[in-house]
Amino acid sequence: MATINQLVRQPRKRLVEKSDVPALQNCPQRRGVCTRVYTTTPKKPNSALRKVCRVRLTNGYEVTSYIGGEGHNLQEHSVVLIRGGRVKDLPGVRYHTVRGSLDTSGVKDRKQGRSKYGAKRPK
């Protein structure tokens, strides 16, 4: 425990909270252009081909973003919207693409949890 005299000479340091999504720069989403669309494999206990894309954002950052849902229409030069949210079993993937906005189509034949995948209500 510090004495009052010590605290007068040197006050306690404020802890600065570090952002989980620095490339967004305090914005809810960011627009960017796909520079590469590819699949990658997850960490140890899991096995799959996860769809990801490398995105050059409007603020100059280049980030890796996960493409959720079954099937997608993204290719190089597609314009996408990026939101925060990491993928636990893909190291270095800290962003998600927003389905159903800009060049990203919604998930086809999606019946439940549609709003997260940009799917319209079935007739």
UniProtKB/Swiss-Prot annotation:
Belongs to the universal ribosomal protein uS12 family. InterPro entries: NA-bd_OB-fold, Ribosomal_uS12, Ribosomal_uS12_bac. The modification 3-methylthioaspartic acid is found at D89. GO terms for cellular component: small ribosomal subunit. One of its GO terms (molecular function) is structural constituent of ribosome. The gene is rpsL. Pfam families: Ribosom_S12_S23. Part of the 30S ribosomal subunit. Contacts proteins S8 and S17. May interact with IF1 in the 30S initiation complex. Residues 113-123 have a biased composition (Basic residues). This is Small ribosomal subunit protein uS12. With S4 and S5 plays an important role in translational accuracy. Interacts with and stabilizes bases of the 16S rRNA that are involved in tRNA selection in the A site and with the mRNA backbone. Located at the interface of the 30S and 50S subunits, it traverses the body of the 30S subunit contacting proteins on the other side and probably holding the rRNA structure together. The combined cluster of proteins S8, S12 and S17 appears to hold together the shoulder and platform of the 30S subunit. Keywords: Methylation, Ribonucleoprotein, Ribosomal protein, RNA-binding, rRNA-binding, tRNA-binding. Residues 101-123 are annotated as: Disordered.
